[in-house]
Swiss-Prot record:
This is Inducible lysine decarboxylase. One of its GO terms (cellular component) is cytosol. Its EC number is 4.1.1.18. It is found in: Cytoplasm. It comes from the Bacteria. Belongs to the Orn/Lys/Arg decarboxylase class-I family. Keywords: Cytoplasm, Decarboxylase, Lyase, Pyridoxal phosphate. It comes from Salmonella typhi. Pfam families: OKR_DC_1, OKR_DC_1_C, OKR_DC_1_N.
Length: 714
């Protein structure tokens, strides 16, 4: 971080000459000097060059107004105002709290001023670094000798082997040196929440508006289990979103709890909807408790917010209405909601604590903020027994955490602190909205078909768009007003083939073809539905990436309209089955898959498959214990009606459990089986289009088997 910007000093000799001297002195201290053309150029520089560490300007020309504009972008940026002895310094005490320092134009003072700028720059870096990261950097710079773990000893061991040296050179020395042992006492402990680790947790809690925050180094899958193990002791009843992440199913397999499922909606596109307001009401819960064997009044509830497709709840309503001691919002996909006003009232940590309740929010820091994979956080509002909670935390946390993951979690919080964090999120929102508008423009100008966007008809400023009962764009039935909102950052592109109400069109392009085309060109889709593709506009998405996606979509249309051969447009798919795809053209492939989907009446089948849940014969915990005792056998998929499932069955997409361990598909819930069979049939007909179904195993003959409990088991 060594870039200093100097604003124009108007060609006045007594001002320019001291600045020339200062330029030379700063270069002698290894600063790089840049000269923005004007105020707008400077502000763009601050937005786009994060290594800028100071601005030098003439007070008479730019004064306090420029300081305020810079502060909106980065309130910690060191500012250096030069003034002559006749300048009017109309600055209040409050203004002086900004990072502005004054110097007088004088020849021969450059060395002293440069030294002060060097000192202020070091203070700036020290000020913006969060506590644990700062302590880790200091430890690495000190280069201490250790006789403890890890065995590679700062990378030294890797360099004793040719292949190890290649590995070392790829990752670099700082990665190696920062991989250290928990025996390093000056860094404190992740498990004991001491020293700089404790300071990091307190820092994160302040940034994320929490009362208590925990860093988790092996993903939100683990964060969810930590919260669940503490909040739902064995023998208790828990309310769980049926569209939960599989980690919540694993929690139910680990702990002997009785689940009662919230029943979310789903539209014709297969987009996961929210849980209706009625599901949170006391009367509905009382009815479910009465209907569920061994159930008692729930002590805990888990809600996925946002949904995979970007739908956020009115969390204020849920906090106020849901009659349980603790509510856990699994917010893995939205770690950024505290940093833009459009998300107020739509996330777990928004607002004040709720009297008599504990609110948890788990977030995958790595998913949409800047952190290493597996970086996750638990935020808490409400009174918990910290010692008992920490037992659950330690149960699921390694005693050898990777400090790079921990520091990246804290650094992600530091990046979101203050105006700079708001600017990052607002930039993501703006890019996503511009992309949406560009898709709509291209659609209106295209000959024939083009892609569409799942969103309201008119989008103007930045907001989360409400799903209303009098609007048709979302495709959901019986929607509650002021309950669900679409996050602009989650962009769902629609392909031709299906109307909003689920009516199948004569012409269609299954989204899986587009996903394969994009993948061949280095663009990875987050989620692919039958006729929709999900793209996440995280803070790492810039204009170049957005334009590359637009270009790829228009190139797909061109290639599709030319009806190119599959082997030319999708060479990787062709290589999977050259004989099958030898003479096939892209339009033939698209129409054949479309007709197969139409034959199964996919929209109606999806509605029916999720309308009636399989029967819960036993809890997931009991089913898993029986599997551990070997009381299972495999049957073909079509034979599972009337059998108790041993494992969860989870098709991807959308990646949420369809059948839970201990559940049985009955005649009433047979559409669940028919939906799974349709997914398998597409893969059987068209090589390369097999659906990944967790819990179903493809055999050599192409048929799928599942694990069920033996019929004589009790």
């Amino acid at each position: 971080m060594n870039v200093i910007a100097i604003m124009n000093h108007m060609g006045v000799y007594f001002k320019e000459e001291p600045i020339r001297e200062l330029h030379r002195a700063l270069e002698g201290l290894n600063f790089r000097i840049v000269y923005p053309n004007d105020r707008e150029d400077l502000l763009k520089l601050i937005e786009n060059n994060s290594r800028l560490c100071g601005v030098i300007f003439d007070w008479d020309k730019y004064n306090l107004e420029l300081c305020e504009e810079i502060s909106k972008l980065n309130e910690y940026m060191p500012l250096y105002a030069f003034a002559n002895s006749y300048s009017t310094l109309d600055v209040s005490l409050n203004d002086l709290r900004m990072q502005v320092r004054f110097f007088e134009y004088a020849l021969g003072a450059a060395a002293d001023i440069a030294a002060k700028i060097r000192q202020n720059t070091d203070e700036y870096i020290d000020n913006i670094l969060p506590p644990l990261t700062k302590a880790l950097f200091k430890y690495v710079r000190e280069g201490k000798y250790t006789f403890c773990t890890p065995g590679h000893m700062g990378g030294t061991a890797f360099q004793k082997s040719p292949v190890g040296s290649i590995f070392y050179d790829f990752f670099g020395p700082n990665t190696m040196k920062s991989d250290i042992s928990i025996s390093v006492s000056e860094l404190g402990s992740l498990l004991d929440h001491s020293g700089p680790h404790k300071e990091a947790e307190e820092y994160i809690a302040r940034v994320f508006n929490a009362e208590r925050s925990y860093m988790v180094t092996n993903g939100t899958s683990t964060a969810n289990k930590i919260v669940g193990m503490y909040s739902a002791p064995a023998g208790s009843t828990v309310l769980i979103d049926r569209n939960c992440h599989k980690s919540l199913t694993h929690l139910m397999m680990m702990s002997d709890i009785t689940p009662i499922y919230f029943r979310p909606t789903r539209n014709a596109y297969g987009i996961l909807g929210g849980i209706p307001q009625s599901e949170f009401q006391h009367a509905t819960i009382a009815k479910r408790v009465k209907e569920t064997p061994n159930a008692t009044w729930p002590v805990h509830a888990v809600i996925t917010n946002s949904t995979y497709d970007g739908l956020l709840y009115n969390t204020d309503y849920i906090k106020k209405t849901l009659d349980v001691k603790s509510i856990h919002f699994d917010s893995a996909w939205v770690p950024y909601t505290n940093f833009s006003p459009i998300y107020q009232g739509k996330c777990g940590m928004s607002g004040d604590r709720v009297e008599g309740k504990i609110i948890y929010e788990t977030q995958s820091t790595h998913k949409l903020l800047a952190a290493f994979s597996q970086a996750s956080m638990i935020h808490v509002k409400g009174d918990i027994n910290e010692e008992t909670f920490n037992e659950a935390y330690m149960m699921h946390t390694t005693t050898s955490p990777h400090y790079g993951i921990v520091a990246s979690t804290e650094t992600a919080a530091a990046m979101m602190k203050g105006n700079a964090g708001k600017r990052l999120i607002n930039g993501s929102i703006e890019r996503a909205i511009k992309f949406r508008k560009e898709i709509k423009r291209l659609k209106s100008e295209s000959d024939g078909w083009f892609f569409d966007v799942w969103q309201p008809e008119h989008i103007d400023g930045a907001e989360c768009w409400p799903l209303r009962s009098d609007s048709a764009w979302h495709g959901f039935k019986n929607i509650d007003n002021e309950h669900m909102y679409l996050d602009p950052i989650k962009v769902t592109i629609l392909t031709p083939g299906m109307k909003k109400d689920g009516t199948m069109d004569e012409f269609g392009i299954p989204a899986s073809l587009v996903a394969k085309y994009l993948d061949e060109r280095g663009i990875i889709v987050e989620k692919t539905g039958p006729y929709n593709l999900l793209f996440l506009f995280s803070i790492g998405i810039d204009k170049t990436k957005a334009l590359s996606l637009l270009r790829a979509l228009t190139e797909f249309k061109r290639a599709f309209d030319l009806n190119l051969r599959v082997k030319n447009i999708l060479p990787a798919l062709y290589r999977e089955a050259p004989e099958f795809y030898e003479n096939m053209r892209i339009q033939e492939l698209a129409q054949n898959i479309h007709k197969l989907v139409e034959h199964h009446n996919l929209p109606d089948l999806m509605y029916r498959a999720f309308e009636v849940l399989p029967k819960m014969v036993m809890t997931p915990y009991t089913a898993f214990q029986k599997e551990l005792h070997g009381e299972t056998e495999e049957v073909y998929l079509e034979e599972m009606v009337g059998r108790v499932n041993a494992n969860m069955i989870l098709p991807y997409p959308p990646g949420v459990p369809l059948v839970m361990p201990g559940e049985m598909i009955t005649e009433e819930s047979r559409p669940v089986l028919e939906f799974l069979q349709m997914l398998c049939e597409i893969g059987a007909h068209y090589p390369g289009f097999e659906t990944d179904i967790h819990g179903a195993y493809r055999q050599a003959d192409g048929r799928y088997t599942v694990k069920v409990l033996k019929e004589n088991t009790k």
